[in-house]
Amino acid sequence: MAKEMAIFGGSFNPIHFGHLIVAECCLEQAQLDQVLFMPAATPPHKQDSTLASPEDRIEMLQLAVESHTQFEVSPQECDRGGISYTVTTVHNLIHQFPNDNLSLILGPDALLSLPSWKEPQRILGLIKILAIERHGVDNIEQLTQEPQLQELLSEKQSYQIKTDRIRAVSYTHLRAHET
């Protein structure tokens, strides 16, 4: 039977409670079987020398998710090295999990920057997007009307961005309850 799996990519420098809450919300609201955390070796939009080593970020992720059976860490991008392009990772995972249904978790900033990614049309053609909407902060319908996204989405009429609106607690709300 096909599993519902979502890829949660990022630098995770470091992973924090916000990431874990987003993953939990995705599990529940999108009825996922698994969230695959995918730390980037070198994020193309964050080529920064202040990143912790890939090994350290993988270890932090593993410690953060070890008690959650539906969370898994994949070192795929770090093992591959170099700049981590989502289109390459998605293509590899589709071949690695041919019988599963894959989704890509994107926050509002990542969704808006999607047109600047490598081969964004191919990404949209290969995988479903789980768009994170921070309660009271973001509105996915409004974001998809932004000119840069409209242009990408209108390039091919056959593309339909299938977004599951995932409502996550805002980071402001999180910070208020950390103490």
Give, region by region, the residue ranges found by the protein language model:
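N-terminal catalytic cores of NTP/NDP-binding nucleotidyl/phosphoryl-transfer enzymes
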Residues: 2-31, 36-39
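Short beta-strand/turn micro-motifs composed of small residues
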Residues: 8, 39, 106, 131-133
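Hydrophobic/aromatic beta-strand patches that form the interior of the parallel beta-sheet core
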Residues: 36, 74, 103, 130, ...
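Conserved small/polar residues in nucleotide/adenosyl-binding loops
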Residues: 172-179
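N-terminal Rossmann-like or analogous alpha/beta NTP/dinucleotide-binding catalytic cores
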Residues: 42-128
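Short, glycine/serine-rich, charged loops/turns that create anion-binding
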Residues: 11-12, 42, 109-110, 134-136
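Short, flexible loop segments at boundaries between secondary-structure elements
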Residues: 127-142, 156-168
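Short, aromatic/basic amphipathic alpha-helical patches
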Residues: 141-152
